[in-house]
Amino acid sequence: MSKLTTGSFSIEDLESVQITINNIVGAAKEAAEEKTKELGHMGPTPFPGLETYRDDWNLKLLDRYEPVVTPMCDQCCYCTYGPCDLSNNKRGACGIDMLGHNGREFFLRVITGTACHAAHGRHLLDHLIEVFGEELPLNLGQSDVLTPNITITTGQRPQTLGEIKPAMEHVEEQLTQLLATVHAGQESAEIDYDSKALFSGSLDHVGMEISDIVQIAALDFPKADPEAPLIEMGMGTIDKDKPFLCVIGHNVGGVTYMMDYMEEHELTDKVELGGLCCTAIDLTRYKEADRRPPYTKVVGSMSKELKIIRSGMPDVIVVDEQCVRGDIVPEAQKLKIPVIASNAKIMYGLPNRTDAGVEETIEELKSGAIPGAVILDYEKLGEISVRLAQEMHPIREAAGVREIPSDEQLKEWVDKCADCGACYLACPIELDIPEAMKFAKQGDFSYLEDLHDACIGCRRCEQVCKKEIPILSVIEKASQKIIAEEKGWMRAGRGQVSDAEIRAEGLNLVMGTTPGIIAIIGCPNYSDCAKAVYYIAEEFLKRNYIVVGTGCGSMDMGMYKDEDGKTLYERFPGGFQSGGLVNIGSCVSNAHITGAAQKVAGIFGGRTMEGNLAEIADYVLNRVGACGLAWGAFSQKASSIGTGCNIYGIPAVLGAHSSKYRRALIAKNYDESKWKVYDARNGEEMPIPPAPEFLLTTAETWQEAIPMMAKACLRPSDNSLGRSIKLTHWMELHDKYIGGLPEDWWKFIRTEADLPLAKRADLMKKLEAERGWEIDWKKKKIISGPKIKFDVSAQPTNLKRLCKGA
């Protein structure tokens, strides 16, 4: 019997019977694999499995960047043998040790994040194929390299929605294999869990890429547009006199139907539609490819979810998936705000009204008979949510629940405070709430106002208050003036970096004359304040780094203004260029950040992209200066995103809370045996400077993070001008934020031309006096001293197989 593929067939000799098969499980992937074999220029690893990258690449990375384990506790409670004490090198009843257990815990978080993005991608892909068909072309802007992550992983270059299916199937298949290794009695070696985590991270970027490219193509999002529209942002942008429909989550599928309903019924100026988290970003991208005037609003990041509910402003809340608080229904109930769950991943125990009538459902929700409902039919969702917001607005105003608490209630709550300090101890960022309460009792609410921006809205303080004071409501009430003026601007997510931008900037990045790419991504679980990401972005933008952002990071960068009242998005261009601030989009748009680095390797470096992860990653690690920042990372998705960057040789700095992820990847910069690569010209070993010296680490303060990130953009292949520019920035930033010169600056000097021009003479004196280097002062040249010699034609690689004659 011939092999079945997708399509339809009929069986002869059966009268009036036709059997139609729309899709055979695995057939799309099998067809893609057959097609892959026919293509030229294919790398060695299309459609990889758990073991594929292990020896060729992952273990090479992990040999240099050794895992640093930070357990949360000494016990393992994973199976019924336990709990087992794993302290002091003891093994559990199953035989696993602390390293293996900790590796499993980190790995579990990575695959959870990968699964989240993959499921997001599967949902959007199936939905958009159902609506638009498999033949819808992937119009993503003026680029030939449309799907770098998919291409590197599968060897395929899909051109339509339907052609993405093999990549989606591959991610799902490998996730099943990865999840199986977590079971008791499976993998026990920490190093192999780390290798599997890196593999999962690469799949995560495939899942994210699928999620974003299908919505860009089908929903008319901006397509690699550096001039995407500016969007109003902040709690102060919401008009309280209008019904407010508030959306929260990451999957914009259902929200587009709300927008369609509003546009069809001419309600865009009569109803406020705004959101939090990545759904907010993506609703501002819908139909914006032609840069029409936007009417939707971005309220802010996840940290504002509870704050916006406590404000009483939303008339209806619609949630979809990812990074949505678990207490939204009970919190909304207090203020008569109906909650609609629009995605099966979050249903909150609410009654399912997907098949119920529109009028019946609106009446149930409006009357308060039910606190909310599950509505998975997007056509109904669009109509019900908008109409319900219009009807709830006057009802809630009449009930007096538009804003809480009253001035009298605020004073009563403040006076109840016993100054016990429990809230201070419970606060994850140690906000001095007792001191603010003390001043508030005296009528000075400025200290409470100061807490508004720093507060991450977790409500842990309220859980421990013996007086049952709703502390978050106290802070928000005291900050009403600030909230009313909380208005920023953010450029709508532009999508991919175009091939043309890569060609224009690739040489500068590889040579080092553009100092590097700084990617500000991740969640708002900041250890200091949200303004830290603004300070970091501004510092690097003024120094002509390319700053790219996604998700909550992109939002928080745009919430603050300079002395002229301008946000960063108004001050700096939106192109992928030196000194450009590029809002790529939502969380799933992170794939385009790794995609940009991959494109540099493929387009500028001439590397084969198809099925060729190790070569692409090797090029990025040695040549492309880039560093990620997830300053408020909290979720499993943040872990998988960062790990996906790591496998491609892109380091990431995380905030102080992120040690709770349990693992960092830090090299020993003093161990010279770790800092050797091959010269691809002849296969000989060549020493390189310790750059980058980590793949994943944490910083305590944003002041510490800035010079750390500048240093992480140094690369072995920098030419002398690029090295001089990068060292100038690193050394200046170290002096500005830490004080003095870095201890190891001299390790990066190969020739006098590497030295920062303005301080060249002084630094040469230090090299002579402190390091014993020989200097020819007449010629102002370094005669001897550097262990690394500059060779402009050297071809550094970690892969022996790439060397000539290998």
Curated annotation (Swiss-Prot):
UniProt-recorded name of the protein: Acetyl-CoA decarbonylase/synthase complex subunit alpha 1
Gene3D superfamilies: 3.30.70.20, 3.40.50.2030, Carbon monoxide dehydrogenase alpha subunit. Chain M, domain 1
Residues bound to [4Fe-4S] cluster 3: C417, C420, C423, C465
Binding site for [4Fe-4S] cluster 2: C76, C79, C84, C94
Cofactor: [4Fe-4S] cluster; [Ni-4Fe-4S] cluster
Entry's EC annotation: 1.2.7.4
Sites where the protein binds [4Fe-4S] cluster 4: C427, C455, C458, C461
Co-factor note (free text): Binds 7 [4Fe-4S] clusters per heterotetramer. Binds 2 [Ni-4Fe-4S] clusters per heterotetramer.
GO biological process: acetyl-CoA metabolic process; methanogenesis, from acetate; response to hydrogen peroxide
Function: Part of the ACDS complex that catalyzes the reversible cleavage of acetyl-CoA, allowing growth on acetate as sole source of carbon and energy. The alpha-epsilon subcomponent functions as a carbon monoxide dehydrogenase.
Origin species: Methanosarcina mazei (strain ATCC BAA-159 / DSM 3647 / Goe1 / Go1 / JCM 11833 / OCM 88)
Reaction catalysed by this enzyme: CO + 2 oxidized [2Fe-2S]-[ferredoxin] + H2O = 2 reduced [2Fe-2S]-[ferredoxin] + CO2 + 2 H(+)
pH effect summary: Optimum pH is 8-9.
Subunit structure: Heterotetramer of two alpha and two epsilon subunits. The ACDS complex is made up of alpha, epsilon, beta, gamma and delta subunits with a probable stoichiometry of (alpha(2)epsilon(2))(4)-beta(8)-(gamma(1)delta(1))(8).
Binding site residues for [Ni-4Fe-4S] cluster: H250, C278, C323, C523, C552, C587
4Fe-4S ferredoxin-type domain location: 406-436, 445-475
